[in-house]
Amino acid sequence: MDDDIAALVVDNGSGMCKAGFAGDDAPRAVFPSIVGRPRHQGVMVGMGQKDSYVGDEAQSKRGILTLKYPIEHGIVTNWDDMEKIWHHTFYNELRVAPEERPVLLTEAPLNPKANREKMTQIMFETFNTPAMYVAIQAVLSLYASGRTTGIVMDSGDGVTHTVPIYEGYALPHAILRLDLAGRDLTDYLMKILTERGYSFTTTAEREIVRDIKEKLCYVALDFEQEMATAASSSSLEKSYELPDGQVITIGNERFRCPEALFQPSFLGMESCGIHETTFNSIMKCDVDIRKDLYANTVLSGGTTMYPGIADRMQKEITALAPSTMKIKIIAPPERKYSVWIGGSILASLSTFQQMWISKQEYDESGPSIVHRKCF
């Protein structure tokens, strides 16, 4: 597709928004899904202070702002802020006119129907797009890995789900969703760092902890053994310099934090860990296709970026599955963006072009058309 008419692909995650042009191999714009509003009254006249900041600008001024994420657990909870993020995406990041190009949006599986109707409505009525489509995130990740059958364990900032897909169709009865993801791990790390005597409380400090998490955390292959190692030596300790120059040391927190993915009881949650959820999802599928799912377990999303997570998944699922089963965990290096990459592939396929919901169809049937045309 030509860049001047290439479709726009926007993957609105709970934590990061990824946007760019169909046919590209990576998103052009990646920025935090944050809207910040000033905490204090502006006193300097002529400073050109705004009443809200989006994305990186909100992040850089976080010391004076209250930061809000309009998407929680993959579901848009604040549409006014969401509109600001889309506006920022089109006009500031990509610098394109949305009324000239089709837009592909993504959504979490098992999202409320009203959510996708509202997305459709805003695209056509506020941004006047000529055509749009809403795709399920996990399905796009599978496309990006070059498969049509497999089970995707997609874990981002707000929600984790396991989606079995057979010959390109998601199997809705077997999709499982776990409201435990990156943001919960950041909160948990804030909590266990407090036990070490470091206090992080504000929305701005939470972003610092998120950075610590991304740079230093990893998944232990054997949690108990790792805890013993951490207790007996300082070999696992790492230091991190805070923005004010203070240096903090972090030890067993490095692997205790992501361990919550496998043991949600750490967060006081009764749900199963990601390994069991994946296994349960496979068990809800027809017995004939399970073998293909075990052999094509694809990890996607930012929360699967921890070193050691693929080996641990392999170990845990092997323990749950029948002993003769061949299990393969696929963790592509670009999995942080695989949803976007899958969207870019999909929107540039010639066979996909008749799948778009056009402005004309929308005008005839209203927002509910999205349920008929997008699955």
From Swiss-Prot:
Q: Name one GO cellular component term.
A: protein-containing complex
In the record, which positions carry Tele-methylhistidine? 73
What gene name does this entry carry? ACTB
Post-translational events:
ISGylated.
Protein name per UniProt: Actin, cytoplasmic 1
Which residues in this protein are found as Methionine (R)-sulfoxide? 44, 47
Q: Which reaction does it catalyse?
A: ATP + H2O = ADP + phosphate + H(+)
Provide this UniProt record's keywords sorted from A to Z: Acetylation, ATP-binding, Cytoplasm, Cytoskeleton, Hydrolase, Methylation, Nucleotide-binding, Nucleus, Oxidation, Ubl conjugation
N-acetylmethionine modifications at: 1
Family indicated by similarity: Belongs to the actin family.
For molecular function, the Gene Ontology terms on record are: ATP binding; hydrolase activity
Additional facts recorded: In vertebrates 3 main groups of actin isoforms, alpha, beta and gamma have been identified. The alpha actins are found in muscle tissues and are a major constituent of the contractile apparatus. The beta and gamma actins coexist in most cell types as components of the cytoskeleton and as mediators of internal cell motility.
Give the quaternary structure.
Polymerization of globular actin (G-actin) leads to a structural filament (F-actin) in the form of a two-stranded helix. Each actin can bind to 4 others. Identified in a IGF2BP1-dependent mRNP granule complex containing untranslated mRNAs. Component of the BAF complex, which includes at least actin (ACTB), ARID1A, ARID1B/BAF250, SMARCA2, SMARCA4/BRG1, ACTL6A/BAF53, ACTL6B/BAF53B, SMARCE1/BAF57 SMARCC1/BAF155, SMARCC2/BAF170, SMARCB1/SNF5/INI1, and one or more of SMARCD1/BAF60A, SMARCD2/BAF60B, or SMARCD3/BAF60C. In muscle cells, the BAF complex also contains DPF3.
What Enzyme Commission number(s) appear in the record? 3.6.4.-
Role this protein plays? Actin is a highly conserved protein that polymerizes to produce filaments that form cross-linked networks in the cytoplasm of cells. Actin exists in both monomeric (G-actin) and polymeric (F-actin) forms, both forms playing key functions, such as cell motility and contraction. In addition to their role in the cytoplasmic cytoskeleton, G- and F-actin also localize in the nucleus, and regulate gene transcription and motility and repair of damaged DNA.
Query: Where are residues bearing N-acetylaspartate located in the sequence?
Result: 2
Q: Which Pfam families match?
A: Actin (PF00022)
According to the UniProt record, what class of enzyme is this? hydrolase
- Tell me where in this chain the PTM N6-methyllysine is found: 84
Q: Could you tell me where this protein is found in the cell? A: Cytoplasm, Cytoskeleton; Nucleus
Under PROSITE patterns, the record lists: ACTINS_1 (PS00406), ACTINS_2 (PS00432), ACTINS_ACT_LIKE (PS01132)
